[in-house]
Amino acid sequence: METTSAFTLNVRLDNIAVVTIDVPGEKMNTLKAEFGVQVRSILKQVRDNKNIRGLIFISAKSDNFIAGADINMIARAKSAQEAEELARQGQQIMAEIHGLSIPVIAAIHGACLGGGLELALACHSRVCTDDAKTVLGLPEVQLGLLPGSGGTQRLPRLVGVSTALEMILTGKQLRPRQALKVGLVDEVVPHSILLTAAVELAQKERQASRHLPVRERILAGPLGRALLFNRVGKKTEQKTKGNYPATKRILDVIETGLSQGSSSGYAAEAKAFGELAMTPQSQALRSIFFASTEVKKDPGSEVAPGPLNAIGVLGGGLMGGGISFVTASKGKLPVRIKDINAKGINHALQYSWQLLDQKVKRRHIKASERDRALALISGTIDFSGFKHRDVVIEAVFEDLQLKQQMVADVEQYCAPHTIFASNTSSLPIGDIAANAARPEQVIGLHFFSPVEKMPLVEVIPHESTSAQTVATVVKLAKRQGKTPIVVADKAGFYVNRILAPYINEAMRLLTEGEKVENVDDALVKFGFPVGPIQLLDEVGIDTGTKIIPVLEAAYGERFSPPANVVSAILNDDRKGRKNGRGFYLYAAKGRKSKKQVDPSVYGLINASGQGKLTAQQCAERCVMMMLNEAARCFDEKVIKNARDGDIGAVFGIGFPPFLGGPFRYMDSLGAGEVVATLQRLASLYGSRFTPCETLKQMAENDLRFWPAQETDPIN
């Protein structure tokens, strides 16, 4: 299929030219290097036709304008010079668009991201639809890059430097009304009149540059700029811990453009883009992007999924409420909640109401969309309305007998084809299905808390689960907006199994005298979003540690927690944030205070809080325990491949994305280095650090988890 058909020029009777963007055979419009020739050809036709009064760029796709540049294009660059040349080509095309003497309008519906927004910025005006699908942003920083086709230069001049810095440094995406407020778009209209509104803009004289607010004009001046960049630089360094080189380059490039002029800015942008594309951080972040894209396309099994028309949820607690919310709001599926009393149902309904109403208040959705989603959720204290549920997700207490009774109830009250999916985090799925009449329709579907925020789910078939059941539940998880990985029915599954030794080692550091904040800060500096001790406080100390005895029983002493630490904390009624008592102090509700450790915890666990280890030593011990267990999971086929293992750790735990996940990280270190580090730690701290056989064999044979060509630095 010819790539030249991605851009089509049509000149209307009123002499307004419309370029329709429609990349053939693909759901999303992305910009590819080979499109440059065609865009230039169209621009030449427009320049040569003196009757054309205006030009409009619009997409033929139902939910995206242009979702960004094709990432494969960057991956194919073999050097910084090649990647820099890609940026220069993009800049030149955008300059040609901007240089047209007639008004050029971007008519935006759906995702307008990365190179898509850079194209829109090159236009003279922008109009977008007032639709939930429409978002505008420059998310390149999330791939370890910066906008390379003029975005770092045009955006500050259009919306002001402080707004531009916030958008480019964080990858923040603006919704239509936000974009209008900051001046990123000129009009917001209903989808039905998008083209009409764009034509009206194109028929007007080219508008003068937008008049920036006084604050933005001050910040663009030398003194204001110096103060702003100094403050933002410190804040960014504090947040990234120096782990994301793209953020510093973004600041440098934008400042260059403002202080030395746009020509210098464009040159600096292209050079920085080329150099960043070759960094290990960008390569790792792009690998996560590719891996998550692949996982989202993976059907889970080769058998076609069963029907997905209506869902049931057992239990109206925190997890049940969250599962119901994503099923209705993301999946657009009717969901019926069954609880033992009306209080549980009301809790789940209120949970969805609060989340949806918050979206309305933030203008992310309309009140009518909120009401439509809520109308999909209903409740019952018996099994009425469950007869025709295709999947029933169980989210009750972690009690084996109770869950087995739930299986029996579903088999009694639901249809013969109904799938029973358990949200257990610790009980074997095979045990839950032990007494089932239809064990092939029993499966694990492990969500992470809070359900509406955490992107990962683990799909856990037991040995009798059918391929169709797997395919159906994987499809449901995707409908719910989740990234599913299929894992084996072994104690702890995957995510909790690699998390537990990491948490245990952090606890050991405390018993050896390390301070709580030093341990947490060490792991945050390493790249985790929060430290292991704070993580326990956030998820609930009781919840976060309940899996450890299960793992200890299954795998032995390497999962043994340091003696009496957890029990001492729990016996003092410390559950973390949820009851305001944990390793950290919590202010009264509604009051904000700086995070502070509760010093009384040291007495509870007989620790001094006077440790001598460096941040690197603390992080190394915790992370190496996680890596060793991840390698065991790979060997035991708990995960299907390294890809799923990396996605599970990054999306489920917050493993540093710029390292690409535990398996890419081990590949970058080399198995020999990982084994040597583990052996050194084992000699210092005990046999729990003994490297697993898989790692030792890989070290001996110089093997990798990922195919070599997928981890080799591009040079």
Curated annotation (Swiss-Prot):
EC number: 4.2.1.17, 5.1.2.3, 1.1.1.35
Region (Enoyl-CoA hydratase): 1-190
Gene Ontology terms describing biological process: fatty acid beta-oxidation
One GO term describing the cellular component: cytoplasm
Annotated positions for site Important for catalytic activity: E118, E140
Pathway per the UniProt entry: Lipid metabolism; fatty acid beta-oxidation
Compartments reported by the entry: Cytoplasm
GO molecular function: 3-hydroxybutyryl-CoA epimerase activity; enoyl-CoA hydratase activity; long-chain-3-hydroxyacyl-CoA dehydrogenase activity; NAD+ binding
A family per Pfam: ECH_1
Catalytic activity: a (3S)-3-hydroxyacyl-CoA = a (2E)-enoyl-CoA + H2O; a 4-saturated-(3S)-3-hydroxyacyl-CoA = a (3E)-enoyl-CoA + H2O; a (3S)-3-hydroxyacyl-CoA + NAD(+) = a 3-oxoacyl-CoA + NADH + H(+); (3S)-3-hydroxybutanoyl-CoA = (3R)-3-hydroxybutanoyl-CoA
Protein name: Fatty acid oxidation complex subunit alpha
Underlying gene: fadJ
